[in-house]
Amino acid sequence: MAAKDVRFSEDARHRMMHGVNVLADAVRVTLGPRGRNVVLEKSFGAPTITKDGVSVAKEIELKDRFENMGAQMVKEVASQTSDVAGDGTTTATVLAQSILREGMKAVAAGMNPMDLKRGVDKAVVAAVEELKKLSKPCEDSKAIGQVGTISANAEESVGKIIAEAMDKVGKEGVITVEEGSGLDNELEVVEGMQFDRGYLSPYFITDQQSMAADLDDPYILIHDKKISNIRDLLPVLESVAKAGKPLLVISEDVEGEALATLVVNTIRGIVKVCAVKAPGFGDRRKAMLEDIAVLTGGTVISEEVGLSLDKVTLDDLGRAKKITVNKENTTIVDGAGSADDIKARVEQVRIQIEEATSDYDKEKLQERVAKLAGGVAVIKVGAATEMEMKEKKARVEDALHATRAAVEEGVVPGGGVALIRALLGIKDLKGANHDQDVGINIARRAMEEPLRQIVNNSGEEASVIVNQIKGGEGNYGYNAATGEFGDMIAMGILDPTKVSRTALQNAASVAGLMITTEAMIAEAPKDEEASPGGAPGMGGGMGGMGGMGDMGMM
């Protein structure tokens, strides 16, 4: 086991604080509409220029292991806030640095770190309650657009396109962000249910121009196993041919003579058929087949529920107004399932979302809800260069995340004003002892810090503006972009409540842990192990040889 370097109390905290300051000072300059740029070196190609706090934080690794531990803990605050709320990374970093800086001073003055932490935690709980009171629901597309614009560093086109996407697919619909091929951002909306499986044979194509199979008012056979024997399919094919409608076959696979017969029937015009593989894998496939069955009013033909292919009637098949199948995707528009059944299925999936523990599972379940509820929107990000594309795509994803947070928990006035107003909640707050009171004051001071930083970045005098805003009430604040005072919400400067809340809670949590740190352990640096003088390793070897000679002499 490698040797360890151990540092205690003041020395440990001092080193950790130095690391925090390096990271936080690099991140805080990006805060606000007049935030400065940070240039990041890349191992190949041109450097990246960004105003995104979390991108700056991710780049920072310090040489000193103890300082690096401090930096990594604050980096965790930023990424945690970004994961939960989509924005607020820089705010969280500024808050954590302020709580930690003031907390370290208090600990150095002989105060009890545990009581300081209790005081800070008490203040944060009260401030969060006040934030919730300030919060207003974010329902109209104008407010949604404003939140998106601010999160995307004041880029109006991003806010606009996110608001438009939410209008099209609903607030809970799936909105994905992809790299586009043009210079401008584009919005593409897929109505109905779409899954990523295309036709099994190009002979199913009905429209040569679009290379797709279009089925109008078709029947849909949903089966969970492979189909290779045509005898199983014949009764269904005959019934569908008599009804004079097309047929879509969704199953694990269709192969051999079964596929050949379907192709021949289609080419001869006896019955128009298209076959696709079932979407997903394993349990997810079962669930998605059930979703399709509910959406189209059909039944999943499965031996598990005692149904076999040769016993299928037209009543077991689903229906839809139109189905389009291309090489990669199948889109079912206007399924014939009953609205009540679809609603019940959506509720069922929502319960699973609440119980899901992994982000991946949650994302997949949300996609299922959106497909059942009717639509997926794709924002295609346009840019002139690949470097700009990556930066822009990250900003659009953040803005989308923040907008969802705003819809979920509402909005508060932006520009650091919400945290100033939340100070009302801790105005008369008292701790159990003097040290806890100091902790409450540390939180109070930290909550002013984001506003101070926004003002500093815009080149104005922070203390004057902070005092002026404290003298106002409600949404009254300072617009750093224009240098005007006024109603922040009327000026379109909003923050999602979830962003302000998460930033404050995460910052206090990590800063509290760091204040109460009494020892730090890291691997000892390798270069200290080499003995001094001569080439590394030579001295030790030679000494050993000398010793051997002495022993021989005796």
Swiss-Prot record:
This enzyme's EC code(s): 5.6.1.7
Compartments, as annotated in UniProt: Cytoplasm
Disulfide bonds: none
Top-tier EC class: isomerase
InterPro entries (UniProt xref): Chaperonin_Cpn60_CS, Cpn60/GroEL, Cpn60/GroEL/TCP-1, GroEL-like_apical_dom_sf, GROEL-like_equatorial_sf, TCP-1-like_intermed_sf
Residue numbers binding ATP: 30-33, 51, 87-91, 415, 479-481, 495
Subcellular location, principal: cytoplasm
Pfam families xref list: Cpn60_TCP1 (PF00118)
Record family assignment: Belongs to the chaperonin (HSP60) family.
Protein's name in the database: Chaperonin GroEL
Organism this protein belongs to: Nitrosococcus oceani (strain ATCC 19707 / BCRC 17464 / JCM 30415 / NCIMB 11848 / C-107)
Gene name linked to the record: groEL
